[in-house]
Amino acid sequence: MDIRLGNGFDVHAFGPGDHVTLCGVKIPHGQGLVGHSDADVAMHTVTDAIYGALAMGDIGQHFPPSDPQWKGAASDIFLKHAVAQASEQGFEINNVDCTLICEFPKIGPHAQAMREAMARIMGMALSRISVKATTSERLGFTGRGEGIACIATAALVRA
């Protein structure tokens, strides 16, 4: 049985705005996230985890931030590409575990909608998508409220 695990990590700083987009869900907040695309740190991290499991590098290799066509792009484009690559190589994504690290906004009230959005985008059962959050106990840049970090793991199984 061919099982692959991939890990992803990403960070985005807070900047001007009135919401953040996480897992494709708009969450009201006094600031936005800064990035070349829509700065969906969670979706970027899951995308990188899938590319990692496939040994295909990272999101920046497939969608370079130096390429103006990706300016402001919706991150589901990137995630759908990674999911398609897995399928083309004969893999099914067994499950995804995504952990957001931030003091705010509070993720709990939005976690179910985030899971549902990711399941829809990835074409997976909701029971195979985990989205959760923790804080850094007010340490580091996330603890100071300067941005959001995210880690994710994706498990792929040869179909």
Curated annotation (Swiss-Prot):
Annotated site residue numbers, Transition state stabilizer: 36, 135
A single GO BP: isopentenyl diphosphate biosynthetic process, methylerythritol 4-phosphate pathway
Cofactor(s) essential for the protein: a divalent metal cation
MF GO annotations: 2-C-methyl-D-erythritol 2,4-cyclodiphosphate synthase activity; metal ion binding
Keyword Lyase in record: yes
InterPro entries, per the entry: MECDP_synthase (IPR003526), MECDP_synthase_CS (IPR020555), MECDP_synthase_sf (IPR036571)
Top-level taxonomic group: Bacteria
Keyword Lyase carried by entry: yes
Free-text remark on how the cofactor is bound: Binds 1 divalent metal cation per subunit.
Binding site for a divalent metal cation: 10, 12, 44
Keywords of this entry: Isoprene biosynthesis, Lyase, Metal-binding
EC number: 4.6.1.12
Coiled coil: none
EC main group: lyase
One Pfam family of this chain: YgbB
CDD domains linked to this entry: MECDP_synthase
Catalytic activity: 4-CDP-2-C-methyl-D-erythritol 2-phosphate = 2-C-methyl-D-erythritol 2,4-cyclic diphosphate + CMP
Binding annotation for 4-CDP-2-C-methyl-D-erythritol 2-phosphate: 10-12, 36-37, 58-60, 134-137, 141, 144
PANTHER family: 2-C-METHYL-D-ERYTHRITOL 2,4-CYCLODIPHOSPHATE SYNTHASE, CHLOROPLASTIC
Quaternary context: Homotrimer.
Family the UniProt entry places it in: Belongs to the IspF family.
Purpose of the protein: Involved in the biosynthesis of isopentenyl diphosphate (IPP) and dimethylallyl diphosphate (DMAPP), two major building blocks of isoprenoid compounds. Catalyzes the conversion of 4-diphosphocytidyl-2-C-methyl-D-erythritol 2-phosphate (CDP-ME2P) to 2-C-methyl-D-erythritol 2,4-cyclodiphosphate (ME-CPP) with a corresponding release of cytidine 5-monophosphate (CMP).
Protein name in the entry: 2-C-methyl-D-erythritol 2,4-cyclodiphosphate synthase
Organism in which the protein naturally occurs: Roseobacter denitrificans (strain ATCC 33942 / OCh 114)
